[in-house]
């Protein structure tokens, strides 16, 4: 029994060897399978781990350098920004100071120009007045040498216009007192006979109530020098003269005066208005005192 089993096993072995010889050598294993088997897989894993570690170290080193460079750039930019802001602020301050200085210089220049213009105007007025006074004095000397028979120029402080001399007061009097003042100067309150004379007088008196030589105290309106009123020049305000009694001063309005716009109005003769004296050039005789 044992021998038979051995024979059978021997036959199986021969059959197996014969079968293997018939099939040929076993096929080679793939490279990946060989690498992943056993110690080779361990070595490959260690190699990859080392490679990854090197890569991580390199990337970390580069990242640290980049962060350091970025930090340096930030500090540089911050310093540059602060420096630029300081410079801009300094320039703004300097610009403001320059602007204020320019404005101050402009104001000083304008003031100097204004003062110079005023000085120039004042100088011209003084020169004009000096020339007028010199001419008047020369005229008066000539009149004295001719025994005062005829005057060819106006006294000092009188203004010549169309062969007449005018004196403009700077204080106020009632109409009758103003009329007496002019008579004492061998003159009369101004008599306006033309639009040209109206403009001349209005220019000198300005917007101030001023007596003229026209009244109706004795009835009809008349000029103090006898000039015909009815046919002569007139420049009344609308609805004037009205001889108004509502002023509460007693009586009506009997004396004429220039108003602030130059037109005429009748008013109470007792009001203290300025006045204008007039005399013909060949009658002017002496200089009145300033009031």
Curated annotation (Swiss-Prot):
Ca(2+) 1 binds at residues 191, 197, 278. Expressed exclusively in hepatic parenchymal cells. Residues 62-291 are extracellular. Glycans are attached at residues 79, 147. Residues 1-30 are annotated as: Disordered. Ca(2+) 2 binds at residues 216, 243, 253-254. The lineage of its organism: Eukaryota, Metazoa, Chordata, Craniata, Vertebrata. It comes from Homo sapiens (Human). A lipid is attached at residue 36 (S-palmitoyl cysteine). Residues 161-278 form the C-type lectin domain. Phosphorylated on a cytoplasmic Ser residue. Residues 1-40 are cytoplasmic. It comes from the Eukaryota. One of its GO terms (molecular function) is metal ion binding. One of its GO terms (biological process) is immune response. Calcium is required for ligand binding. It holds the Pfam family Lectin_N. This is Asialoglycoprotein receptor 1. Residues 61-123 form a coiled coil.
């Amino acid at each position: 029994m044992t021998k038979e089993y051995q024979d059978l096993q021997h036959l199986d072995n021969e059959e197996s060897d014969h079968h293997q010889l018939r099939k040929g050598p076993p096929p080679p294993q793939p490279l990946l399978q060989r690498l992943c088997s056993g110690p080779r897989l361990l070595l490959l894993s260690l190699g990859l781990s080392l490679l990854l570690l090197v890569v991580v170290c390199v990337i970390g080193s580069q990242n640290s350098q980049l962060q350091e460079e970025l930090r340096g750039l930030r500090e540089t930019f911050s310093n540059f920004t602060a420096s630029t802001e300081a410079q801009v602020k300094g320039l703004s301050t300097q610009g403001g100071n320059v602007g204020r200085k320019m404005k101050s210089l402009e104001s000083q220049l304008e003031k100097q120009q204004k003062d110079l213009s005023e000085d120039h105007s004042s100088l011209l007025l003084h020169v004009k007045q000096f020339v007028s006074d010199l001419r008047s004095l020369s005229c008066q000397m000539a009149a004295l040498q001719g025994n005062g028979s005829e005057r060819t120029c106006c006294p000092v402080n009188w203004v010549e216009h169309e062969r007449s001399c005018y004196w403009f007061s700077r204080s106020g009097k009632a109409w009758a007192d103003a009329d007496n003042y002019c008579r004492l100067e061998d003159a009369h309150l101004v008599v306006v006979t033309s639009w040209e004379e109206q403009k001349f007088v209005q220019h000198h008196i300005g917007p101030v109530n001023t007596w003229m030589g026209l009244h109706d105290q004795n009835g009809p309106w008349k000029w103090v020098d006898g000039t015909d009123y009815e046919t002569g020049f007139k420049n009344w305000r609308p609805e004037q003269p009205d001889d108004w009694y509502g002023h509460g001063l007693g009586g009506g309005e009997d004396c004429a005066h220039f108003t602030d716009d130059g037109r005429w109005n009748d008013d109470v003769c007792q009001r203290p208005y300025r006045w204008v004296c007039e005399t013909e050039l060949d009658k002017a005789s002496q200089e009145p005192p300033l009031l």
